[in-house]
Amino acid sequence: MELEFQRNGERYNFLKWAQESFQNVRIVPPGAGICHQLNIEQFAQVAMTSTAAGVETPEGENPTVYFDTLVGTDSHTPTANGIGVLGWGVGGIEAEAAALGQPITTLVPKVVGVRLTGELSEGVAAMDVALTFAKMLREKGVVGCFVECFGPGLDSLNATQRTCISNMTPEYGSTCTLFPVDDQTLAYLRLTGRSEQQVALVEQYAKAQGFWNDPQAPERVYSDVVELDLSSVKRSIAGPSRPHDRIFLEQAQERFHEICADRGLDLGKKETVDVNGRACELGHGALAIAAVTSCTTATDPSMMLTAGLVAKKAAEAGLKPKPWVKCILAPGSHATELLLERAGLMDGLRDLGFYTCGFG
């Protein structure tokens, strides 16, 4: 961080000046975490109050309530869709224009509904759902579309699982992957420190606008609908080349051999490489990087805790990574690392060589 400030001191001084000089400007210090993770943890309001001019309503006057919306220069800005905030990634010029008060223009898109039923099987994570979405929606073709999730299966997904699914929107090809507001959303807002007044406002406004997830309400009409039974989702691996080239974990070995055969690779071929003065023999399929990271994984605490538990058990069993494996730990925010610390799981990660290299 010291080097970061040395190299970018002039930029940071300018940003600090901007925060002190203008209303409605908040600057997040470097090293705090990745933008969309901080947004769902701290900044997103879901429902907001102000006058049309963007100035807080004076006491005693009736405020204007409106939905929180978001544009960001990171392609995974749709993470906030998981807690009911409509938003997507834009280019730098569009973002600057929005920051200076100009409107964002967009064509009215097709809205594709994803009807969710059932619930996830034990051991299946939100990332597995996201990879299933990627394959399903890529095959459907949703480029330029809004995707909205609905159906009885919503009740089985908590808010962080939803944000994990929304996070991978760019991999689906859609503009956003929006979830409605419900009790799961409110529980997350409370957990992350939003006031009871704010939580009550979100609930009342979502219900008044028809954005509340009400199982008894008539289903909305969409341009098209695809269905997914969550109980059919299996543990999956992304790749080998693209996220939607999904491989079921149970078929990983078989698919690896098939892919090598398709590419004409000799599985018996070995190469000797020098790793810190030690000769190591590597072949096709050798793991080079073990990364507990990505903004997608860090969005859902249960996946980070799973990684911590695996590391703890591995360390207790005396296991160590091979010398050629680079180990990386990059939580999405300080809150994610604090969760691992308080759960007593950081020691196991460090024993295996997973030290925090940064946040985000």
What does each model-found stretch correspond to?
Residues M1-G360:
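Fe-S-dependent hydro-lyases/dehydratases of central metabolism
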